[in-house]
Amino acid sequence: MPCGKQGNLQVPGSKVLPGLGEGCKEMWLRKVIYGGEVWGKSPEPEFPSLVNLCQSWKINNLMSTVHSDEAGMLSYFLFEELMRCDKDSMPDGNLSEEEKLFLSYFPLHKFELEQNIKELNTLADQVDTTHELLTKTSLVASSSGAVSGVMNILGLALAPVTAGGSLMLSATGTGLGAAAAITNIVTNVLENRSNSAARDKASRLGPLTTSHEAFGGINWSEIEAAGFCVNKCVKAIQGIKDLHAYQMAKSNSGFMAMVKNFVAKRHIPFWTARGVQRAFEGTTLAMTNGAWVMGAAGAGFLLMKDMSSFLQSWKHLEDGARTETAEELRALAKKLEQELDRLTQHHRHLPQKASQTCSSSRGRAVRGSRVVKPEGSRSPLPWPVVEHQPRLGPGVALRTPKRTVSAPRMLGHQPAPPAPARKGRQAPGRHRQ
């Protein structure tokens, strides 16, 4: 079908659509409705319902480069064509305008609800998958933090015995703990971002049960985790300084002798004390007994915290690693499924209602066509007719016919009995004696 003459096509109550003639409109509708080529023979219709029309709309990508006003016009034409195609299939019962509109819009509304339910379930699965991956990462980070705590405790325990081994264990454990803390912070940020994005998408599909604000409220657990992260990073930097000091001391044999004397006796000459204190200030070698006890207690507390986090993550993975956001999205999808079932039942009930209305209307029409005569009216049927008897000769009696046609009894009217014959009357054809 060639395209008609280009012109401005205007729909009543809307703006003018420039450059779209009547032939172009028919060509576009055929492209959308029938799914065939624009130029060529029209194939058989493959999209008989509004749902398939919407799917064809998306597949053909005809609206990707169309202005919003033009898209509105084309949408109007599409709906007009749909109403024309579905007019014959609309039930003719005594339905209200609202019920007829419901029957017209139900396929589109059903398609939208099915798409929303599918998208909500997909979002919930994505949130659970992301949460499971981040939980495994947090599990590894917690185990690394626990190993870091063990190494710090061993470094403190070996400080009086070996200076190099103690500093090496302490620095490695502190660095590993800082890396684990940073990993936990990053996983928390990524999980919050994933949940926020999923909730933003779900809020466009339906109302959520709980409100969510990106920067609302104070999350004390995240603040605590950030504090531990900063503390471990500071300790890691200090451990690097301790290792650097140990390497400097190891390169000088005389200085190492003074360090060993300081570690054994806690006493060195006053002219060299300042250099030793400056070299090992804040290290495990320069700790007093009280500081050593406090350091061991802090390392033990961090070790217990990392072990508790590890066990919680492990148990959460065994339970399926489900999040509250995913459960809320699935609850919303379940609610939409219930609404879809209710609308489907109502859609099935309307054609039955229309058919029952049509049958009752036909019954009333048949009953109204019958003529009921009033009481006392005369029957249109003739009275009983006696069979015709030929005139007989003299001396032959008249025979009474065996069969007579009886008149039907009408409502409120009985046929009058025949008059009795007079005694002095003789039968015709007989002569007096």
UniProtKB/Swiss-Prot annotation:
<keyword id="KW-0445">Lipid transport</keyword>
<dbReference type="GO" id="GO:0005576">
    <property type="term" value="C:extracellular region"/>
</dbReference>
<dbReference type="GO" id="GO:0005737">
    <property type="term" value="C:cytoplasm"/>
</dbReference>
<dbReference type="Pfam" id="PF05461">
    <property type="entry name" value="ApoL"/>
</dbReference>
<dbReference type="GO" id="GO:0042157">
    <property type="term" value="P:lipoprotein metabolic process"/>
</dbReference>
<comment type="function">
    <text>May affect the movement of lipids in the cytoplasm or allow the binding of lipids to organelles.</text>
</comment>
<comment type="similarity">
    <text>Belongs to the apolipoprotein L family.</text>
</comment>
<feature type="compositionally biased region" description="Basic residues">
    <location>
        <begin position="422"/>
        <end position="433"/>
    </location>
</feature>
<dbReference type="GO" id="GO:0008289">
    <property type="term" value="F:lipid binding"/>
</dbReference>
<protein>
    <recommendedName>
        <fullName>Apolipoprotein L5</fullName>
    </recommendedName>
</protein>
<feature type="region of interest" description="Disordered">
    <location>
        <begin position="346"/>
        <end position="433"/>
    </location>
</feature>
<feature type="compositionally biased region" description="Low complexity">
    <location>
        <begin position="359"/>
        <end position="371"/>
    </location>
</feature>
<dbReference type="GO" id="GO:0006629">
    <property type="term" value="P:lipid metabolic process"/>
</dbReference>
<keyword id="KW-0963">Cytoplasm</keyword>
<keyword id="KW-0813">Transport</keyword>
<dbReference type="GO" id="GO:0008035">
    <property type="term" value="F:high-density lipoprotein particle binding"/>
</dbReference>
<dbReference type="GO" id="GO:0006869">
    <property type="term" value="P:lipid transport"/>
</dbReference>
<dbReference type="InterPro" id="IPR008405">
    <property type="entry name" value="ApoL"/>
</dbReference>
